[in-house]
Curated annotation (Swiss-Prot):
Summary of the function given for this chain in its UniProt record: Antitoxin component of a type II toxin-antitoxin (TA) system. Upon expression in E.coli neutralizes the effect of cognate toxin VapC. The VapB/VapC complex probably regulates transcription of its own promoter.
Protein name as annotated: Antitoxin VapB
Keywords: DNA-binding, Plasmid, Toxin-antitoxin system
Gene Ontology molecular-function annotations: DNA binding
GN (gene name): vapB
Keyword DNA-binding in record: yes
Quaternary structure, from the entry: Homodimer. Forms a hetero-octamer (4 VapB and 4 VapC) complex with toxin VapC. The complex binds 2 different sites in the vapBC promoter, probably via VapB dimerization.
Length: 75
């Protein structure tokens, strides 16, 4: 979804369309910069949804190929 960026009191602002608006109770956000990408999340909740979400499926990396054990000198 595309939207507009504009200046408000010499700061950049982003107009969020209704379809992607934050909940009304969100008053502060965190902005994470990854290259030219910006990720906006409610302040203090950046990882909450990730950890509260579904875990990986039972077959996740079931057929993971690993090299054999290495023999190393002990310290």
């Amino acid at each position: 979804m595309e939207t507009t960026v504009f200046l408000s009191n010499r700061s950049q602002a982003v107009r969020l369309p209704k379809a992607v608006a934050l909940p009304e109770n969100v008053k502060r956000v965190e902005v994470i910069a990854v290259g030219r990408t910006r990720i906006i999340t409610p302040a203090g909740e950046t990882w909450d949804e990730w950890f509260d979400g579904h875990s990986v499926s039972t077959d996740f990396m079931d057929n993971r190929e690993q090299p054999g054990m290495q023999e190393r000198e002990s310290f």
